[in-house]
């Protein structure tokens, strides 16, 4: 008799969560922010997958300029498993945390200066299922895959637009960074195929924006050693020995190649004290308020507060501890390379902007340049600096297939390290201006 109790409780939980499918709420106040929000925020869930069992949580922020005509973006954070709230409060959203020692109260939110929502409507989407506040009503669901996530994001966007039909005609872009940069080209392909095969009205798909994106992860990682040499983190002698012994392949090494393995250990000793997401910043303990990464803890304190969850209209019981980047969200990484998707999307005429912070050692700009070269696109504008107030902000190159590469001088793995430069870069590109 007692063995039925856990099953009964599980059934009750599933029935409880089922009642909350496909909901949305307008949020005028957020805990931690003083006064009413100075922008329009909506949160909610859209059910996708078999019988809508996967409930995708989103934050939608209207453009502060002209929401009826400004572009509509869906933003996906990396990981896989990072909540899109990361993008909202740390990268390109209208809110950020006041960085101060946590005292047990709700962390303070403040307005930001360089939000992309000044010129665009943005849906910050928690994906894959399990990231952020997204959840599955099926406790036995298979772990998500890259291609599966691409299909579900396509389904999410179509269902979201069906509930927000005023945005069907807005120019639509898929945006994100890091690991999501590998999946985004596949999402663009899914949406494009849906437009041609099945679905009316069509989504006004125009292109995509990816920041320090994973393309072919092993090759991306291989570029770390040449990058480290280029910025004087390893010696000429070690670099030449690595090239000679490893043949340029540093992430997948023959276990019998003991000389290469030994040299890679020497390399790791040299860079172990480096903060790889932005090598200019110190590597330090996250628990110290003086450490840059301390700000990430504030989002964890904030999102795990019950008052906050009620304000966001998070379904009660749908999520245990919220993690900014939940490493337990393990995905089947079945897209080994995004390059075929880039090529297919360019043939269809979609625009793309590839942003690369030039001091990121996680996905170095050298690897990004290498996979772009492999596309064999003809160059329409040669490598040149792009400027802000007569100062070099980075370098750019434009290709015939509507792809633009832009580095950000002094930038890191994500947009947050150079918010002004990334905001100006995005505004110029999205409006069709020269960088």
Curated annotation (Swiss-Prot):
Key words, A-Z? Carboxypeptidase, Disulfide bond, Glycoprotein, Hydrolase, Protease, Secreted, Signal
Q: Where in the cell is it found?
A: Secreted
Enzyme nomenclature, EC number: 3.4.16.-
Pfam (any one): Peptidase_S10
Catalytic residues identified in the record? 178, 360, 413
Taxonomically, the superkingdom here is: Eukaryota
The top EC class, named as a word, is: hydrolase
According to the record, which residues are glycosylated?
A: 103, 344, 376
Q: List the disulfide bonds.
A: 82-325, 246-260, 284-291
Q: Identify the main location.
A: secreted
Q: Which GO terms describe its biological process?
A: proteolysis
An example of a Gene Ontology cellular component annotation for this protein is: extracellular region
InterPro entries annotated for this entry?
Answer: AB_hydrolase_fold, Peptidase_S10
* N-terminal signal peptide: 1-23
Question: What is the annotated tissue distribution of the protein whose record heads this document?
Answer: Expressed in senescent leaves.
Q: Which GO terms describe its molecular function?
A: serine-type carboxypeptidase activity
Protein family (similarity comment): Belongs to the peptidase S10 family.
Q: What does this protein do?
A: Probable carboxypeptidase.
Would you tell me the protein name for this molecule? Answer: Serine carboxypeptidase-like 14
Q: What is the lineage of its organism?
A: Eukaryota, Viridiplantae, Streptophyta, Embryophyta, Tracheophyta
